């Protein structure tokens, strides 16, 4: 089972709101997911992104692959840098 960290669209027509979720890569965009990690609201200025950093790190270490959009959000928040430092740290 390939697991992805991606966005699930919520909200109403023309008023999108997204949840950052962990889901099986074969499930549909707005379908079943394993767990919710945070939210993303593109309508606010500045765009509002909230997520549980510890849970995201845990899923990345388990092998979950972030989508391109989620990867960019995590890079801006500094999570991807922490993940790579932890992954390639000298032991």
Swiss-Prot record:
Transmembrane segments: none annotated. Pfam families: Ribosomal_S16. The keyword Ribonucleoprotein applies. HAMAP family: Ribosomal_bS16. SUPFAM superfamilies: Ribosomal protein S16 (SSF54565). GO terms for biological process: translation. It comes from the Bacteria. One of its GO terms (molecular function) is structural constituent of ribosome. The keyword Ribosomal protein applies. One of its GO terms (cellular component) is small ribosomal subunit. This is Small ribosomal subunit protein bS16. Keywords: Ribonucleoprotein, Ribosomal protein. PANTHER family: 30S RIBOSOMAL PROTEIN S16, SMALL RIBOSOMAL SUBUNIT PROTEIN BS16M. InterPro entries: Ribosomal_bS16 (IPR000307), Ribosomal_bS16_dom_sf (IPR023803). Belongs to the bacterial ribosomal protein bS16 family.
């Amino acid at each position: 089972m390939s697991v992805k960290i991606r966005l699930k669209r919520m909200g109403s027509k023309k008023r999108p709101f997204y949840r950052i979720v962990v889901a099986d890569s074969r499930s549909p965009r707005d379908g079943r997911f394993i767990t919710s990690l945070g939210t993303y609201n593109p309508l606010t200025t500045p765009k509002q992104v909230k997520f549980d950093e510890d849970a995201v790190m845990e899923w990345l270490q388990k092998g979950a692959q972030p989508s391109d959009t989620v990867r960019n959000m995590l890079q801006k928040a500094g999570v991807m840098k922490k993940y790579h430092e932890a992954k390639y740290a000298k032991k």
